[in-house]
């Protein structure tokens, strides 16, 4: 059995190194071999230039493909894995196209493992644990109101004037600002077309409590069922969102204003220009520590009184083992690979 790890970007290295150093049969595929060698300096491993046809030739039944490539590659690689009776792992959200491969994977007797990084990933574990604990409390009745919050973000450990730094291309962050979101607020669906219209303050209950800015991200509603909320629960609030440093909204106000005006091909071109400029001005320096904050919170109330409330939280930062983001994304991926092995 071989592990074909595709992609050696900044979020991939700690987990990849762990698999190699633990003695697993790992083959690395990267679009630029020299970059992969530099990232894995001092580690003995076979590295090939990424090409899906070359990967297909070397892929054998029971092998595992790990995709740490851009999202467009996940489904093609998962399809390749199924066709060769191999397994597939990624840290990314399950797209509708990936979901449609479920029955084919079952028929082939292989695993497709996704959403196994930080967010999505570790946040799911925290959410399921909270829901299970609330159910076991036996405090719930028909009048209980439930509020769920899950906020995650990567920020610079030492805040800068821009209130953010980039560890890879800013284009994904900029495009996400053009994405709508759905959540529940005050018992009703809350739909937002522009994230900056829903930015609020959040007091994170860390060991040293700290105020951040948060906003809803993507479509939160399918996770009500995924986290196995009781169908009879009255859901007052349910939101999965992004966390940023206090002052981020003000620092990015002019960016929000410009993004609102961008459309079509000219808009895409301008986004790329902005991305390149932000990368020059606000990329992490070598060995500069980042910081990751994750808070998952579940609260139950009856007659305006809190009867149950718990928060799972994580506050991590980069060190000699790698950035916090890289460790928290790639280590869970490596654990999933080990589970399949």
Predicted ranges, named:
Residues 80-98:
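ADP-ribose/adenylate-binding Rossmann-like module
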Residues 63-68, 88-90:
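N-terminal Rossmann-like NAD(P) cofactor-binding module of classical short-chain dehydrogenase/reductase
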Residues 26-39:
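NAD(P)-binding Rossmann-fold cofactor-contacting core
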Residues 133-341:
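C-terminal catalytic/substrate-binding lobe primarily of soluble NAD(P)-dependent oxidoreductases
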Residues 42-53:
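Rossmann-fold cofactor-recognition segment
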